[in-house]
Amino acid sequence: MKDFAKYAFNKSHAACYAVVAYQTAYLKVHFPVQYMAWLISSVTDKTSKVAEYILAAREMGISILPVDVNKSVAEFGVEGKNIRFGFNAVKSMGRPTITAIIEERTNNGDFHSMQDFITRMAGVINKRTVEHLILAGAFDTFGNTRRGMMNVYERMIDSAVKQNKDAISGQMSLFDFVSEEDKQSLEMKVPDIQEFEKEDLLEREKEVLGVYVTGHPLDEYTGMW
């Protein structure tokens, strides 16, 4: 620290920087996943920095997991030895919407399908939010293709909004007379269609996240040079 304090600044200023440098180095060595998650979260408004730090994390052997409606939190989070993308990184996701999603999940359990998510969050989300979550991979956990979900999400939202309006006006619907288990069987189905071509899928992903997460367009050329 004494040697560091001799460099350019007055001693008190340089000593403070030295302390921060040593603390940061300690955290990076002993708590690498937590440190990188915090570091990436600190620059979510700077896409180029997010990409830079994600690359650095991967070079450290840390996997970056995509957004997940049942696992993501607002910031980049620690999940075992991996880092999970946070909702803050998704284009058009505001803090009130993120808070509402996490609270709904905490109070009433995980979402079991995209339609379940849309139905439970109909008063908070809009079509753009759902579109961006689809393209970010947030619903991949349900086993549907992103292309299939893009094909049907608008109709799901329109249906959920109508149900909400009917509930407010006191009108009854078929869903009022069936059990929770039966409601799941009556859900609008996501069509089982082929996924987007890899390059198209990744470009759409990058459009809403600012970075590639589940792959890279040049992956197939790895090892050719």
Q: Residue ranges of each PLM-predicted region?
A:
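Noncatalytic, beta-rich nucleic-acid-contacting surfaces in large DNA/RNA-processing enzymes
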Residues: M1-W225
